[in-house]
């Protein structure tokens, strides 16, 4: 059976780029979060909803928020498949999931983890498997570990501007997570062997930063800039975080 799709995604530059091929389809609604808050009233209720001082059961106007953010319109009456990114689903958002299930009884519900499940601190994977029709992971090991389906990171076809800059031999961009030592060792080995490197590390504390004249320590990078830098490099470096086997979207 064919479906219309509601994707509860992310406002991150990569995700909006990776899913751009389907965003303009009449059968797809892409939201940059679970809520897609777009007016002051629902934004205020949303803020109340996420304060740790207010338990779910005491939230005023909860149904008003749910109605405001679940008014989906398609050109036909096909059933809906709701696909959520993993970080959107946690204890605070379970009630909204049940609201959707009550109001869309013919719908299917899928969830896609695009990072290791262990990095989602509030995820009860057994609960997730009980309440979703389809559970996916970008990482092959995670899929095996938790008994869910493996699905590689999606991409869309987009034009890339190379921009202006010196061509590099090797390019790396990423948060260090649990691989800082391996990243620095790779940098040292490559530069000692004469390679021109463009290393960009995200969110590294100042006291931990080394080779600061040559390595770029940043808070974030627009995904289009990442693509531009990658296109000016001969090779991209992938260093998987520990326990991971799924490749990440370097370009």
Language-model-derived ranges and their functions:
Residues 82-83, 110:
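Short, conserved beta-strand segments within well-ordered enzyme catalytic domains
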Residues 79-80, 107:
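Residue-level recognition of the N-termini of beta-strands and the immediately preceding loop/turn
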Residues 100-116:
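Active-site proximal beta-strand in glycosyltransferases
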Residues 1-71, 75-77, 85-96, 114-251:
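Nucleotide-sugar donor-binding catalytic core of glycosyltransferases
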């Amino acid at each position: 059976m064919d479906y219309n799709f509601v994707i509860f995604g992310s406002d991150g530059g990569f995700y909006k780029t990776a899913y751009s091929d389907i965003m303009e389809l009449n059968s797809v609604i892409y939201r940059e979060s679970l809520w897609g808050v777009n007016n002051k009233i629902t934004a205020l209720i949303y803020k109340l909803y996420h304060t740790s001082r207010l338990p779910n059961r005491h939230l005023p106007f909860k149904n008003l928020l749910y109605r405001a953010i679940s008014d989906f319109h398609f050109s036909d009456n096909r059933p809906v498949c709701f696909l959520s990114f993993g970080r959107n689903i946690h204890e605070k958002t379970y009630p909204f999931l049940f609201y959707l299930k009550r109001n869309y009884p013919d719908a299917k519900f899928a969830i896609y983890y695009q990072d290791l499940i262990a990095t989602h601190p509030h995820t009860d994977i057994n609960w997730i498997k009980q309440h979703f029709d389809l559970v996916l992971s970008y990482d092959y090991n995670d899929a095996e570990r938790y008994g869910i389906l493996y699905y590689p990171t999606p991409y869309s076809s987009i034009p890339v501007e190379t921009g202006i800059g010196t061509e590099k031999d090797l390019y790396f961009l990423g948060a260090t997570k649990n691989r800082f030592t391996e990243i620095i060792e790779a940098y040292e080995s490559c530069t000692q062997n004469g390679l021109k490197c463009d290393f960009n590390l995200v969110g590294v504390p100042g006291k931990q930063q080394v080779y600061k004249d040559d390595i770029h320590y940043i808070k974030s990078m627009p995904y289009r800039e990442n693509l531009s830098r990658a296109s000016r490099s001969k090779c991209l470096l992938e260093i998987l975080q520990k326990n991971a086997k799924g490749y990440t979207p370097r370009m």
